[in-house]
Curated annotation (Swiss-Prot):
Cofactor(s) for this UniProt protein: Mg(2+)
Ligand binding (5-phospho-alpha-D-ribose 1-diphosphate): 84, 87-88, 92, 94-97, 112-120, 124
Cofactor remark from the record: Binds 2 magnesium ions per monomer.
Annotated binding of Mg(2+) 1, by residue: 96, 230
Function: Catalyzes the transfer of the phosphoribosyl group of 5-phosphorylribose-1-pyrophosphate (PRPP) to anthranilate to yield N-(5'-phosphoribosyl)-anthranilate (PRA).
Protein name, as recorded: Anthranilate phosphoribosyltransferase
Organismal lineage: Bacteria, Pseudomonadati, Pseudomonadota, Gammaproteobacteria, Lysobacterales
Reaction it catalyzes: N-(5-phospho-beta-D-ribosyl)anthranilate + diphosphate = 5-phospho-alpha-D-ribose 1-diphosphate + anthranilate
One example of a Gene Ontology biological process annotation: L-tryptophan biosynthetic process
Length: 344
């Protein structure tokens, strides 16, 4: 039976799940601009109140992937995305962006998907620009830089132009919707391994199961007990691990990896410029909470990418490339590559 926007809204009002294949039909209609703004807003608000299910999220993500501009990475060995939903409200420096250079220096290939800031002080695109990189690389160029250097950034508006269809509605609504959790699920390089931070502990298991439905090989979905969408230094972190087709949940703490507990205030910034300075201090090997949190998250990325045997081994590899300058070298090479005349 075909799923119309009206039928979908009726399902939602009655607190019934929209089946995954029905969600695929619905999202295709939305992405093809066949659904009015009023109906889109009603469906998005209703899903938020009802709470989106694994099948609904997976169906919506499937369609967003269909409509994306793909990045074809030839050698997919140890290919990983380090990504977060954002929206945790903590305004920390760009931990995952820093971690991508560390993970690449230690042997992973990082295909990072991101955007400018909406609610934080500095989005991944903002800090990369502050570092001097060009963020507007086309899909072929992103594949090339990943192949040459081991790291690439996919600027969401370039790879998901169809999102312009729903942007006015989302902007006017001004609240979180399913689209806030779809972005990290729609990596244009189809990275088979994912380290994903989420802003809500309830999403840890949900997103891990969604990634399984979407065909991910390995994933770590993390949320600090303080609400941080990274592995946190301030408290324990809830982890949902997808491996071998199964999801298990557990907790880790900074002390597990020889790190001191540290308040999030030590990691907060007010602008992309401040985030840039903190990121450069970390890549210079300056000890402290910022370096620790980057090593922790890069270590998790190296584990999920299959480079490290476990998170602790990954942390050790991350510290090594931070202290010997290899991580900073990856950043410098990346910026230079993206600024070549044909990319500007």
């Amino acid at each position: 039976m075909s799923m119309t926007p009206q039928k979908a809204l009726q399902c939602i009002i009655e607190h019934r799940e929209i089946l995954q294949d029905e969600m695929v039909q619905l999202m295709r209609q939305i992405m093809n601009a066949e659904v009015s703004g009023i109906m889109v807003a009603a469906i998005l608000a209703g899903l938020r109140v009802k709470k989106e299910t694994v099948g609904e999220i997976a169906g919506a993500a499937t369609v967003m992937r269909e409509f994306s501009r793909k990045v074809n990475v030839q050698d997919r060995t140890h290919l990983v995305d380090i990504v977060g939903t954002g929206g945790d409200g903590w305004h920390t420096f760009n931990i995952s962006t820093c971690a991508m250079f560390v993970a690449a220096a230690a042997g992973a290939k990082v295909a990072k998907h991101g955007n400018r800031s909406v609610s934080s002080k500095s989005g991944s695109a903002d800090v990369l620009e502050a570092l001097g990189a060009s963020i507007e690389l086309q899909p072929l160029e992103v594949a090339e830089v990943i192949g040459c250097i081991g790291v690439g950034f996919m600027f969401a508006p370039i790879h998901h132009p169809v999102m312009q269809v729903v942007s006015p509605v989302r902007r006017e609504m001004g609240v979180r919707t399913i689209f806030n959790i779809l972005g990290p699920l729609t990596n244009p390089a189809d990275a088979p391994n994912i380290l994903m931070g989420v802003f809500d502990p309830d999403l840890v298991g949900i997103q891990a199961h969604v990634l399984h439905k979407l065909g991910a090989e390995r994933a770590l979905v993390v949320c600090g007990r303080d609400g941080m969408d990274e592995l946190s230094l301030g408290t324990t972190t809830l982890v949902g691990e997808l491996r071998g087709g199964r999801v298990r949940e557990y907790e880790v703490s900074p002390e597990d990896y020889g790190m001191a507990v540290s308040p999030i205030s030590n990691l907060q910034v007010e602008s992309p410029a401040e985030s840039r300075e903190m990121l450069l201090d970390v890549l210079a090997g300056q000890p402290g909470p910022a370096l620790d949190v980057v090593a922790l998250n890069a270590g998790a990325a190296l584990y999920v990418a299959g480079v490290a045997q476990d998170i602790g081994h990954g942390v050790a590899l991350a510290r090594e490339v931070l202290f010997d300058g290899r991580a900073r070298d990856i950043l410098d090479r990346y910026v230079a590559f993206t600024r070549r005349p044909r990319y500007v």
